[in-house]
């Protein structure tokens, strides 16, 4: 079975084959970096981390570009509030982002372009749009995109122009010929700091001092780093409209070619079945969550839901994820896993692959991991344990030491617990089973569960 991916553009699951055999080019809209990453950002980056891992496991060479928006109204406002330069703020936030996603085990993209490094390319694309009659200078001095002049507008979101015109979300902004038009180049304002302005004349254009609009940033960066047409464009479902719709209008309007063959969007994160927002007090940064839960538990919690489905965040769901992951590690603790190269003809591996090949079906793939763990529990097979670990690696799971995961959070230190386990073993050898049972009960009272196996006794924290 070949890989099939849900394409937002066609609203159907389609067979995937890259433009260049054996090579996949993928662009994902990344962070606007004015604050710390929250759990919604983690969900997006984790979703495409799994996509990247599975494409590589499937034998593809992957060029994965995830951009950084480092110039934006919110960034300017935050830098001014803090009394620092835009560059100082964005450097600080990028370092924090890398620390947070590194803690979650998210593999880095091939390239991570910053918007401010591609302003000449953005201006060049605006120039092409102006030449084709798709861009104009508004009365406010901004360069705007003339939406009604692009015949394919709305094809990604499925929205008609008349529907958008009537919609309450579309504000009539000063200086535009049509309220649907959007800004390509924002003219500079006196009140803005100098490091928020570029002189377009110095770069060969006559649009005055200003800065690029958000949408043109991604069009220019994706074209420059991946070419005019590439395989996969991804991002959160909230970006489908207007951001990705506007990217299509810009890139296809300028280049006359499809921007991306597949459009892939991950679902929203809700908190206790409510939208996550600072105003509701249910807004969680990655750092907040890492104070309560380990990184692998967070990863397991996120990817056991299908990437397109809504993800409901709650402590109860994370607790359940931790307990579920313990079941997998308990199997790996029974026997030292052999080093196994995956044989995709193996029945477990074949079902895992079939699940992942059907639109990155992580829930079904994880179900196979639990079945395989059950096999390890029954057979104590080092080869089966090795396959479990190797398949887990395709999802970024089960690469830690089982004992370290199972014993995390114990009240007693390791040495004290091990001393009691040794005493219990001595009591059993002396056939003093009452003493052995007392030690087991004593440890259980402190939240430590003992597991006996042919390899000896291990322990874990009680769920």
From Swiss-Prot:
Disulfide bonds: none annotated. The keyword Lipid biosynthesis does not apply. ATP binds at residue 278. It catalyses: tRNA(Cys) + L-cysteine + ATP = L-cysteinyl-tRNA(Cys) + AMP + diphosphate. It is found in: Cytoplasm. InterPro entries: Cys-tRNA-ligase, Cys-tRNA-synt_Ia_DALR, Cys-tRNA/MSH_ligase, CysS_C, Rossmann-like_a/b/a_fold, tRNA-synt_1_cat_dom, tRNAsynth_Ia_anticodon-bd. NCBIfam families: cysS. HAMAP family: Cys_tRNA_synth (MF_00041). This is Cysteine--tRNA ligase. The lineage of its organism: Bacteria, Pseudomonadati, Pseudomonadota, Betaproteobacteria, Burkholderiales. The gene is cysS.
């Amino acid at each position: 079975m070949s890989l099939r991916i849900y394409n937002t553009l066609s609203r159907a699951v389609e067979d995937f084959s890259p433009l260049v055999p054996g090579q996949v080019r993928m662009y994902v809209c990344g962070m606007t970096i004015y604050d710390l990453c929250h759990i919604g950002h983690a969900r997006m980056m984790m979703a495409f981390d799994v996509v990247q891992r599975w494409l590589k496991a499937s034998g593809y060479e992957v060029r994965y570009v995830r951009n950084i928006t480092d110039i934006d109204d919110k960034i300017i406002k935050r830098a001014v509030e803090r009394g620092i330069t835009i560059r100082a703020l964005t450097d600080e936030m990028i370092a924090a982002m890398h620390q947070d996603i590194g803690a979650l085990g998210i593999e880095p993209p091939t390239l991570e372009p910053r918007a401010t490094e591609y302003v000449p390319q953005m201006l060049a694309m605006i120039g092409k749009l102006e030449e084709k009659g798709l861009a104009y200078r508004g009365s406010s001095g901004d360069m705007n995109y003339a939406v009604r002049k692009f015949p394919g507008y709305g094809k990604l979101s499925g929205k008609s122009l008349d529907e958008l015109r009537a919609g309450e979300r579309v504000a009539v902004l000063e200086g535009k010929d049509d309220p649907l038009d959007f800004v390509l180049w924002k003219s500079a304002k006196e009140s803005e700091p100098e490091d928020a302005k570029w002189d377009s004349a110095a770069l060969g254009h006559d649009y005055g001092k200003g800065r690029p609009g958000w949408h043109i940033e991604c069009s220019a960066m994706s074209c420059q780093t991946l070419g005019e047409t590439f395989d996969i464009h991804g991002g959160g479902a909230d970006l489908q409209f207007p951001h990705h719709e506007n990217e299509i209008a810009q890139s296809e309007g300028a280049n006359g070619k499809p921007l991306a063959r597949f459009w892939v969007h991950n679902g929203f994160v809700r908190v206790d079945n409510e939208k996550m927002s600072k105003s509701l007090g249910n807004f969680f940064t990655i750092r907040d969550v890492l104070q309560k839960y380990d990184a692998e538990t967070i990863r397991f919690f996120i990817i056991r839901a299908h990437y397109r489905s809504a993800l409901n965040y709650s402590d109860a769901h994370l607790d359940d994820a931790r307990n579920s992951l313990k079941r997998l590690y308990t199997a790996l603790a029974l026997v030292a896993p052999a080093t196994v190269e995956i044989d995709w003809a193996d029945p477990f591996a074949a079902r895992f692959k079939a699940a992942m090949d059907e639109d990155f079906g992580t829930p079904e793939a994880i179900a196979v991991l639990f079945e395989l763990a059950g096999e390890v529990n029954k057979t104590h097979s080092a080869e089966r344990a090795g396959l479990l670990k190797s398949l887990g690696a395709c999802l970024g799971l089960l690469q830690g030491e089982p004992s370290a995961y199972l014993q995390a959070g114990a009240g007693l230190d390791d040495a004290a617990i091990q001393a009691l386990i040794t005493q219990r073993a001595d009591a059993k050898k002396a056939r003093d089973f009452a003493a052995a049972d007392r030690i087991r009960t004593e440890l259980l009272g402190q939240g430590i569960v003992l597991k006996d196996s042919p390899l000896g006794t291990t322990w874990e924290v009680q769920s």
